[in-house]
Amino acid sequence: NLKGVDLTSASLGFKIINTRGFNSTSPVRSLQLIDGVDNQAPGLNFSLGNFLGASELDIKRVELIVGASSGIYGPNAFNGVIDMETKSPFDFKGVSVQTRVGERNLKEVMLRVADGIEDENGRGIAFKVNLAYLTADDWEADNYEPTEQSQAGILNAGGYDAINVYGDENISDGANNFSGDYGQRNFPGLGIYHRSGYKESDLVDYNTENLKFSSALHYKFNKKVEAIYAFNFGTGTTVYQGDNRYSLKDIRFQQHRFEIRQKDKFFIRAYRTSEDAGGSYDAVFTALLLQDSSQSNSSWSNNYNTYWILQVRPKVWNLPGFPNPQVNPSVWFGDSKDSTYGVANNVYATFSDSINSWHSEARSYADSLANKPGNLPYFIPGTAKFDSAFAHITTQNTFQQGGSRFYDKSSLSHFQAEYKFEPSFMDILVGGSYRVYNPSSQGTIFSDTGGVVISNYEYGGYLNLKRKFLDEKLILTATARVDKNQNFDYVTSPA
């Protein structure tokens, strides 16, 4: 338990660390580094955690810096930094294997192989290879309580807006709400009703998989200076929680890094990160498009209340004790209106089983009726028609084209250098970085349709001064950083 640190589980394969009370599944203001390399997805713009990170067997150290760290690490480190360092093949040689099993059919196996040679002058070469694979049955989102926005409760005969059911939200312009004066008089017992939606479990692949591969080649020029080429690759399927629920399916992520460094003195680092969203899609939009593929919300709503008028309303009027407006319409107006509503509501409560049954009939009628050209009945999960419509929607790129898949083959290229001067009176650290983003989403994330090519760059520099006093018992530091993004003014970060 660390003060000010929260661990959020968006899914079994997705653990997100938050600091400073910003508990989010998209910690865009927290910086995650692995051997100095930013672990963010270039297009999705959030760190994918260790789902596409380093193998557990290869982790040497994890440092969590809570609080604003923009002075050294840049403006993205507003909430803090998670800095992971992997093991050097010069220091950690041999073969390591680890496996574990657990609940929800979890199986994980990891392998690390490392070796190297080094002469008496420190010159040498070493390599390491890591492989990790995880598979499990992810937690299913099965909370069917009403959302905060739902106008109806769980006992409402016409349904309600459930948390993990999508497509059952309120229809625009209140077209599903007949609880007002007009509805009470002309649609007795109809009240509020919600369209038949789709459970998340019918839309999302809960079979979590994660494959990670990394390799590195280290060359030492002497005992101090070494060059490194590293390659990291990750792929898998999991669920991500953002504004909507997303199925990250067969997402792929790779990094190439080249670095020359002398520990605690200098480094020159360049890396490139590329991603491919694979077959990932938005589960909520998928539900909405499945509904729209059968019939529009307005058509479904009209079918529902038409059935109520023609088939149910006469039955409601004839319920014992109901104030039938055909017999005495005046009681529904004026001073007697409120008492009449009270009598009607008591009748609804007395004959609630009948009201529930009639709503089920109206729902079945609206779900099955295709009264316009091109309309189809509700796609029942598990049927061939559902599978066909689902496959079509999740393989089309944009919502406008009838698809919920998001295309993302974005990349970023980063160059960074740092040098430490050590005069007798203080330590002086200077550094700078330059980054270029190359988004590619075919309009599913960015406005890059019609052949539009987007590119964005940013750069920054920093200076850190450190002075020690009283036999190094007192240390004073001062940091200043300046950053510039192509689309924004200069930003300074003193500390």
Positions of the model-derived regions?
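Short sequence motifs at beta-strands and strand-loop junctions characteristic
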Residues: 9-11, 74, 102-105, 203-210, ...
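Structural signature of Gram-negative outer-membrane beta-barrels, strongest in the C-terminal barrel
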Residues: 222-223, 230-235, 260-263, 273, ...
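Short acidic/polar hinge/loop motifs at secondary-structure boundaries
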Residues: 38-66, 85
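Hydrophobic, lipid-facing positions within transmembrane beta-strands of outer-membrane proteins
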Residues: 15, 80, 93, 107-111, ...
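Outer-membrane beta-barrel domain signature, strongest for Gram-negative TonB-dependent receptors
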Residues: 154-428, 432-435
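Short strand-turn segments of transmembrane beta-barrel domains in outer membranes
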Residues: 69-71, 81, 86-118, 131-133, ...
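Outer-envelope beta-barrel architecture signal
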Residues: 28-30, 91-95, 107, 121-127, ...
